[in-house]
Amino acid sequence: MIELKHVTFGYNKKQMVLQDINITIPDGENVGILGESGCGKSTLASLVLGLFKPVKGEIYLSDNAVLPIFQHPLTSFNPDWTIETSLKEALYYYRGLTDNTAQDQLLIQHLSTFELNAQLLTKLPSEVSGGQLQRFNVMRSLLAQPRVLICDEITSNLDVIAEQNVINILKAQTITNLNHFIVISHDLSVLQRLVNRIIVLKDGMIVDDFTIEELFNVDRHPYTKELVQAFSY
């Protein structure tokens, strides 16, 4: 379970980015955090990951194996390491896998799943496309076998086909391996395909919280209706 109780956070004392956030996520529930840029979505993810400490309130995670997938993959990779080195480091650090043959077999399996060419493994992060690097970014997190996965705008660098491929892979992972799956996005269509619950943030506060089946209910918050209408065009 993930639980946030009365969490408030600000980068300085004068302005709070998040205010009195209360969220409970039971095991097995996939949650989307929806809102415009600047509403506090990424800050919320950073708090759950333990990168920041709340000014007020408490955050409880029942599982320590939490990993992120961020929007900009280039900053997530060591620029001086090949893609292969970065992927194998995840296998060693998180799973204790030191056998090179076993590492290679896992990489080959995942390359096929993500529809990526093995020749790209010898490249540096700067030598592959943004879409390819983002798929490697997702692959690296899944190779580590986290119990909780937090994805922050992960489809922003992907074309339509690659986006659907990654979504299908993540959906399969939520069935087999993940306790929790949290997706941070401003794209409602992505959330509709990945999660069963949506929490809406506006100006650092939760204004709506509902299951995906309740998305079009008449009692949705006006801001939620505004977002839904914007994505319907």
UniProtKB/Swiss-Prot annotation:
InterPro entries: AAA+_ATPase, ABC_transp_ATP-bind, ABC_transporter-like_ATP-bd, P-loop_NTPase
Major subcellular site: membrane
GO cellular-component term (any): plasma membrane
Catalytic activity from the UniProt record: Ni(2+)(out) + ATP + H2O = Ni(2+)(in) + ADP + phosphate + H(+)
PANTHER family cross-referenced by the UniProt entry: TRANSPORT ATP-BINDING PROTEIN (PTHR43776)
Membership in a protein family: Belongs to the ABC transporter superfamily.
Subunit structure: The complex is composed of two ATP-binding proteins (NikD and NikE), two transmembrane proteins (NikB and NikC) and a solute-binding protein (NikA).
Name recorded for this polypeptide: Nickel import system ATP-binding protein NikE
Organism, scientific name: Staphylococcus aureus (strain MRSA252)
